[in-house]
Amino acid sequence: MSFRCFSFALFLLLLTFISHVSASYIPNKKSFKSRSFKNQFLIPQNIARAAVGLRPLVWDDKLTHYAQWYANQRRNDCALEHSNGPYGENIFWGSGVGWNPAQAVSAWVDEKQFYNYWHNSCVDGEMCGHYTQVVWGSTTKVGCASVVCSDDKGTFMTCNYDPPGNYYGERPY
């Protein structure tokens, strides 16, 4: 099978995965480390990486704990602010409580349409940095977390990446 066919097949697999994930899945403290929760973050990111010929990310508990710590910091305000920590980071906010990890990853990966590889830049007026972090070639580990914010302010999710990516002037892969 050619690389293009393989990439297209992986893309279809990602769409199938996302369409079958329940929109009502909200992890509690006990389940934030569950295999299903991890896989909802990990599998679609690894499909996006495979589509551009990269090795899969490995789930990392240290990054997961950092992500959970930071998500807990955002619980009261649900603000889309980065932690400014030592890792690469993607953040997501959705109104209400019906959001799942695969939807957050889908929002990040959907930015691919705004990334111009040849110019190594985003289309004017669009974001693509979440996508480029997902597919950053030297990144090997990821850990993610989610919280439902206070006073019905929404759902906040974050993934942290090590080594970090998105270095100015460098292509992701």
Curated annotation (Swiss-Prot):
The disulfide bridges present are 78-149, 122-128, 144-159
In terms of superkingdom, the source organism counts as: Eukaryota
Statement: the UniProt record of this protein carries the keyword Cytoplasm: no
A Pfam family annotated for this chain is CAP
**Signal peptide residues on this chain, from the entry's feature table:** 1-23
SUPFAM superfamilies named among the record's database cross-references: PR-1-like
Query: What InterPro entries does its record include?
Result: Allrgn_V5/Tpx1_CS, CAP_dom, CAP_sf, CRISP-related, V5_allergen-like
Which PANTHER family would you find in this protein's record?
CYSTEINE-RICH SECRETORY PROTEIN-RELATED (PTHR10334)
According to its UniProt entry, one GO biological process term is: defense response
**Protein name (database record):** Pathogenesis-related protein PR-1
> What family is this protein classified in?
Belongs to the CRISP family.
Q: Upper taxonomic classification of the species? A: Eukaryota, Viridiplantae, Streptophyta, Embryophyta, Tracheophyta
Q: Which PROSITE patterns match?
A: CRISP_1 (PS01009), CRISP_2 (PS01010)
